[in-house]
Amino acid sequence: MPSHFVSPTPTLPLPAGWRPVDLDARAVRALMTARAGGASQPPYDTCNLGDHVGDAPSAVAHNRRLLADHMQAVPIWLTQVHGNRVVRLSHTPDPSDPDVITPVAGGAPQPHADGSFTTEPGLACTVMVADCLPILL
C-alpha cells in the first residue's frame, strides 16, 4: 500500500472480507465491504446495508453505524434507480439546486440517483452493488 494511503480507520480492525481500496491518491479513500461483520440475521447475515430488502431496521442501522465508524465520514446513501441522475454531496445546502444533497441529523430521505460526487472532506459517496460494477473516478 502506498505510504500516503490512509486506511478508513486504522485503529479499528476491519471485519472479515472488508478491504480498503488501494488508490494512488492523497485525498481519496475507498472501502469495499463484504457480508461478514454485522448484526443482521439470516438470510441477510451479517452485514446487510440495504434498508429496502426486508431486513430488521435496527440491524441495518447498526450495520450502517459500523460502516460510518470505520470510514470516519458521513455516508450519504442513494436510492439507486438505474437512471442518469448524479448528485453533489455538500455540507452547505443550496436551495436553488435540487442535485445538491446535504447530510441531515437523524437521517434524510435517500435521493433517487445512481451516482454521487463530493469535493468536501467528511462526506462519503456510498453505493450498494450486487450485480453492478461500481466506478470510482
Region locations from a protein language model:
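Active-site microenvironment for binding and transforming phosphate-containing groups
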Residues: 1-137
